[in-house]
């Protein structure tokens, strides 16, 4: 098993957060 470091967890959370924001913005633009 590979141990996941804290830095990798932070990067994963930030990337997921940014992806969610971009998806919400695209959704709002499409629903207008």
From Swiss-Prot:
Answer whether the UniProt record assigns the keyword Membrane to this protein: yes
Does the keyword field hold Glycosyltransferase?
A: no
Which InterPro entries does the record associate with it?
PSI_PsaM, PSI_PsaM_sf
Annotated Gene Ontology cellular components are: chloroplast thylakoid membrane; photosystem I
Gene name, please? psaM
Q: What is its main location?
A: plastid
- Please report the record's description of how this protein sits within the membrane: Single-pass membrane protein
SUPFAM superfamilies given in the database record:
Subunit XII of photosystem I reaction centre, PsaM
Write the protein's name: Photosystem I reaction center subunit XII
The alphabetized list of GO BP terms reads: photosynthesis
Keywords on record:
Chloroplast, Membrane, Photosynthesis, Photosystem I, Plastid, Thylakoid, Transmembrane, Transmembrane helix
Q: Where is this gene product found?
A: Plastid, Chloroplast thylakoid membrane
Residue intervals passing through the bilayer: 10-27
Species source reads Staurastrum punctulatum (Green alga)
What family, per the record?
A: Belongs to the PsaM family.
